Swiss-Prot record:
It comes from Mus musculus (Mouse). This is Sodium/hydrogen exchanger 7. The keyword Glycoprotein applies. The lineage of its organism: Eukaryota, Metazoa, Chordata, Craniata, Vertebrata. It is found in: Golgi apparatus, trans-Golgi network membrane; Recycling endosome membrane; Cell membrane. Glycans are attached at residue 145. Residues 688-705 have a biased composition (Basic and acidic residues). Interacts with SCAMP1, SCAMP2 and SCAMP5; may participate in its shuttling from trans-Golgi network to recycling endosomes. GO terms for cellular component: membrane; plasma membrane; recycling endosome membrane; trans-Golgi network. N-glycosylated.
Amino acid sequence: MEPSDAARPGPGRAFRGLSPRLLLLPLLPVLLGRGLRAGAAASSGAAAEDSSAMEELATEKEAEESHRQDSVSLLTFILLLTLTILTIWLFKHRRVRFLHETGLAMIYGLIVGVILRYGTPATSGHDKSLSCTQEDRAFSTLLVNVSGKFFEYTLKGEISPGKINNVEQNDMLRKVTFDPEVFFNILLPPIIFHAGYSLKKRHFFRNLGSILAYAFLGTAVSCFIIGNLMYGVVKLMKIVGQLSDKFYYTDCLFFGAIISATDPVTVLAIFNELHADVDLYALLFGESVLNDAVAIVLSSSIVAYQPAGLNTHAFDAAAFFKSVGIFLGIFSGSFTMGAVTGVVTALVTKFTKLHCFPLLETALFFLMSWSTFLLAEACGFTGVVAVLFCGITQAHYTYNNLSVESRSRSKQLFEVLHFLAENFIFSYMGLALFTFQKHVFSPIFIIGAFVAIFLGRAAHIYPLSFFLNLGRRHKIGWNFQHMMMFSGLRGAMAFALAIRDTASYARQMMFTTTLLIVFFTVWVIGGGTTPMLSWLNIRVGVEELSEEDQNENRWQYFRVGVDPDQDPPPNNDSFQVLQGDGMDSVGGSRTKQESAWIFRLWYIFDHNYLKPILTHSGPPLTTTLPAWCGLLARCLTSPQVYDNQEPLREDDSDFILTEGDLTLTYGDSTVTANGSSSSYTASTSLECGRRTKSSSEEVLERDLGMGDQKVSSRGTPLVFPLQENA
């Protein structure tokens, strides 16, 4: 008989008599494992949070330290500028004969550079060197995965292996080393614009032919002579085993281009203080202004030289002419862009009421002028050329449309910016000698460079002066030529061009050599300017009317027909007697209309059309344009022209004189350019009228053999007073 279901033991009933605690024993390992995992997770999470907090704290400390170092570096340069300003003020009261404040600013920079280089401790633990291989060139941007976190790094340049543990570990030295683009986009525009905006056009255009010859032909000659001589030096370095990397012929030409950029700021400052001869000042200033523009375009053309074939540095006629075309295209395009920007600014200031708000007017003028540089660079042209001709155009047209307050503000604004930028660059040059990380010193290359620039300057000045004197009636004397040869300083432009590209071994050697050349020329040549003026018997103390006197239309006596190398003759209150033959004047006047026709045409076009269109001055367009352009003429002519037919004048603007600007004074008689006279005989009046018939072209014909400028009466050449444009 089978037992019943009630008597049969079931699974639950078998353990019914056991304790509940004993039933949990099999689950204990599982529960313990989960608890341990949960505890480990909690502890790891807390550790991760602590680690993240520590990283954030370290990042904040690094950011704070970086901000502090930035403030210290900027404060360093501000203190350098402050010290330079105080030095300039001191030099105004007590001049040091053989030292200029520009050279002293470089000395201040050197002292600070030594302190930063050897007096600041090197940081450690922040930089690590990692080795990697790549088939291509160095990456400009690198994305690094560090434990699941991605960090972005940017390329700063190649570092020589021997300097990894020295300069590169000093964060302070990194802070005071600026990006080269800072010089081009921030510091150079106000310097170049001020040169064009403050240009004394009367003296500049009187010597325009010679200035263009020195700036274009002279710079090209200097570039190729220096480049070829330095190529010989490089070959010598290779023979003696002092060349550790590649140095091509195109690199030598590039060095010749950048080192041909003269910047006689020290000499010109001394000329201005001593009131040296205005023609010598105009030649040096005009050459340096255009020379900078030519040098930067020439260097860009050399960089663009790419011959066909495997050897990218061999001579190729097609590539050469292509580089010449690039030079002409960049220069003409930059010139056009600068002039167009100036014209647009003139139109905006003419056809708006901005003159009622001088602050807005000055701000717009400033932004339009600065944007010219950036616009040219963005379009592939050269901003230096564009902003230079923008400044000249602004001074010739836009200046007339500005209110009196805006005129003063704009001049003072760019003068201050020019002063600060230039002194900042010279102070930074001294600093860079010890803080720059990529110096390559080569004694043979440095000595060869000094010899090459001396020979290049000599080949630049003397042969060109000889050929120019063949066509100039007023010769460039030997003392002027020696002074121009002596005044070939290198400065801000050469430094900015050299520091812009220091990626290769050759460019680093160029930068170091350029820096030393700038030091030498500023200290030695700048300090020897005053003794050289005395030794060459160049006259100083040539007074020129102030701007206030010009605005009040006071008379200024202008010496015509006199060699600027000679001492000024004695004069009295009514006239100056110049030595010469009156018949030469009559013979010279016959060639006036043949030699100055280009300038006459430009002056007529500018006076009758451009000035009335772009400014509030000049004759009404209704009288100069054809009748069928009457509507357009009425729209473009300013109402001020109808109210006041007398043209508004700008400071030193019209480099060609009008008939009314010319008056001859002889004894108690006055003869105007149109032949009218007072207290004088009719025959003499008619004679003087014939001699001064082409008086509006006389100023132009000073250069390149453009006729004789002597005006005589009864066999005695005279000097006539000119009414300076206000």
